[in-house]
Amino acid sequence: MRNITSFFKTFLLWELLKGMKVTGKHFFTRKVTVQYPDEKTPISNRFRGLHALRRYENGEERCIACKLCEVVCPALAITINSTEREDGSRRTSSYEIDLFKCIFCGYCEESCPVDSIVETNILEYHFEERGENIMTKAKLLAIGDKYEAQIAADRLQDKDFR
């Protein structure tokens, strides 16, 4: 009896028919593919995208040059140089992030004591020239100024988890 069932399963391609049954069952269901440039899926407020530097309400940059983000970065993508002011406080003279090295882990954002460096939910960006992958302090501050309302809203929504 065992040989007969084995014979029918082999010559009738039983495994192939079982696979085709699964394919046929899912053939008429709703598709889950998104046509990316035209359609976009919703992005979480915790998404880790392009970096930005924030300012205080009075316009002064938040970064105090503590260099915690530079130390905690596992990819060594952040470089900070600082200068001391007349009042004794430190501020950054240069702040650079190499986006080719960055792995977007979010450690820089978590380690910042003054909430200066943040990762926005900017997903789409490109480079046309060599060297544009280095995000300078001016570029990071410009991104922060442009998207401050969105960054603040995401922070407010996520405050219970920080």
Curated annotation (Swiss-Prot):
Predominant location category: membrane
EC number: 7.1.1.-
Subcellular localization, as worded in the UniProt entry: Cell inner membrane
Signal peptide: none
Pfam families in the cross-refs: Fer4_7
Cofactor: binding details: Binds 2 [4Fe-4S] clusters per subunit.
Its membrane topology: Peripheral membrane protein
GO CC, one annotated term: plasma membrane
Domain of life: Bacteria
Coiled-coil stretches: none
Function field: NDH-1 shuttles electrons from NADH, via FMN and iron-sulfur (Fe-S) centers, to quinones in the respiratory chain. The immediate electron acceptor for the enzyme in this species is believed to be ubiquinone. Couples the redox reaction to proton translocation (for every two electrons transferred, four hydrogen ions are translocated across the cytoplasmic membrane), and thus conserves the redox energy in a proton gradient.
Name of the featured protein: NADH-quinone oxidoreductase subunit I
Classification lineage: Bacteria, Pseudomonadati, Pseudomonadota, Gammaproteobacteria, Thiotrichales
